[in-house]
């Protein structure tokens, strides 16, 4: 009885043949349908009805379980016979009632298999369906790959993914910030406001925004750009007006609040009042001043200028267009922008825009003519030295005679 039920149920398992000693060997009409049934369809299990086919993802799993059960129940020889059976049906030896009943059961199952095979080809699983999100991701991948390869994705040309990416619109003005086009009236008002004030406070900005029908952000950005343009213009003007510029090795200008030592206004008997030194009287026609000092320096371009205030020793100034003092010792005196301790009054002097060049310990002092004890109108040497004064004692505080200028 158990064998009979087993062979009766065998019709449901894909139409395989299970021969008995007293029955015919039979085969399905076509093994292709049986193979399709065993591969893709899970309706061959005895639990399910052959007509109902649930669209689930676990069909293959159920099919595998059923086939495993059938293979465990069947013999090894029968399995090999199933794999090696040719397409045409085999000849039958002797019919039996059991085989006829199994054929009756087989016929509806085979018809169900034939009706289910077209459904397999038409069925689309959820993971096969193309959703909007998948399409968008695919379009993004194609577009990015096309941009990397330099291909025209935005013109509808096929990209590396083999599709024409029409999903994305080409990047136009909508994706970028629109450039603000100011009218002439707005530009005039903005320029006028910038002329009076380069930085706008917020109340004034709000007022101008309402007046010019602009946003505060537009006005703020316009003022930022205008300030940058103004800085560039100032830089270009500065370079154009001063071709040499203020290089670090150029001497600083001697006209300023820090250089108030000697000036051309000392004429008419005005004395220079330092904190401790006595007033200088008897000014002559051309006093040593800033104008007189800077006048001869216009013709020469100094290379190097170092003021060593500690090494400066003050020197007396004689008459003939110079200051002199009999009691300059032990008193700080303003020389070349520095107050230094004075030495005894000596022969060399400042005379009408010429730097004194007394001979002694050398101090680097460029753009000054190298002048020994005598005065001479000579050209500027590139690297002359400003030397200290020889300590000539002034006899009884009297002024020494004026030395002559000579050019070395």
Curated annotation (Swiss-Prot):
Residues 175-234 bind DNA. GO terms for molecular function: DNA-binding transcription factor activity, RNA polymerase II-specific; RNA polymerase II cis-regulatory region sequence-specific DNA binding. A motif (Antp-type hexapeptide) lies at residues 124-129. Keywords: Developmental protein, DNA-binding, Homeobox, Nucleus, Transcription, Transcription regulation. Residues 68-83, 134-143, 387-398 have a biased composition (Polar residues). One of its GO terms (cellular component) is nucleus. Its main location: nucleus. Residues 1-27, 44-120, 132-179, 233-278, 376-408 are annotated as: Disordered. Residues 91-116 have a biased composition (Low complexity). It is found in: Nucleus. One of its GO terms (biological process) is anterior/posterior pattern specification. Gene3D superfamilies: Homeodomain-like. Sequence-specific transcription factor which is part of a developmental regulatory system that provides cells with specific positional identities on the anterior-posterior axis. Belongs to the Antp homeobox family. This is Homeobox protein Hox-D3a. The lineage of its organism: Eukaryota, Metazoa, Chordata, Craniata, Vertebrata.
């Amino acid at each position: 009885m158990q064998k009979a039920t087993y062979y009766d149920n065998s019709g449901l398992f894909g139409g395989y043949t299970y021969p008995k000693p007293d029955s015919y060997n039979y085969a399905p009409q076509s093994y292709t349908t049986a193979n399709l049934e065993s591969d893709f369809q899970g309706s061959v299990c005895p639990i399910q009805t052959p007509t109902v086919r649930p669209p689930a993802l676990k069909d293959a799993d159920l099919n595998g379980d059923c086939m495993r059960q059938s293979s465990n129940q069947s013999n090894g020889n029968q399995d090999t016979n199933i794999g090696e059976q040719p397409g045409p049906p085999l000849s039958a030896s002797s019919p039996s009632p059991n085989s006829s009943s199994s054929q009756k059961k087989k016929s509806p199952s085979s018809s169900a298999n034939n009706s289910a095979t077209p459904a397999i080809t038409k069925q689309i699983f959820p993971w096969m369906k193309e959703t909007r999100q998948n399409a968008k991701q695919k379009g993004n991948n194609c577009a990015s790959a096309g941009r990397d390869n330099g291909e025209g994705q935005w013109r509808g040309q096929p990209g590396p993914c083999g599709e024409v990416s029409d999903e994305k619109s080409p990047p136009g003005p909508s994706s970028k910030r629109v450039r603000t086009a100011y009218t002439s009236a707005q530009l005039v008002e903005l320029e006028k406001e910038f002329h009076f004030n380069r930085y706008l406070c917020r109340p004034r900005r709000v007022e101008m925004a309402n007046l010019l029908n602009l946003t505060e952000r537009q006005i703020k950005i316009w003022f930022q750009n205008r300030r940058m343009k103004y800085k560039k213009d100032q830089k270009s003007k500065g370079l154009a007006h001063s071709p040499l510029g203020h290089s670090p090795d150029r001497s600083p200008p001697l006209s300023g609040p820090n250089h108030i030592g000697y000036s051309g206004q000392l004429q008419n008997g005005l004395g220079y009042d330092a904190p401790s030194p006595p007033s200088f009287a008897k000014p002559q026609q051309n006093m040593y001043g800033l104008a007189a000092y800077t006048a001869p320096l216009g013709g020469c371009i100094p290379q190097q200028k170092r003021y060593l205030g500690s090494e400066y020793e003050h020197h007396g100034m004689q008459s003939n267009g110079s200051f002199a003092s009999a009691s300059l010792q032990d008193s700080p005196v303003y020389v070349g922008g520095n107050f230094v301790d004075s030495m005894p009054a000596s022969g060399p002097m400042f005379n009408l825009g010429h730097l004194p060049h007394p001979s002694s310990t050398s101090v680097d002092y460029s753009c000054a003519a190298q002048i020994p004890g005598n005065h001479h109108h000579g050209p500027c040497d590139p690297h002359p030295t400003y030397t200290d004064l020889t300590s000539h004692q002034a006899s009884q505080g009297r002024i020494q005679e004026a030395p002559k200028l000579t050019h070395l």
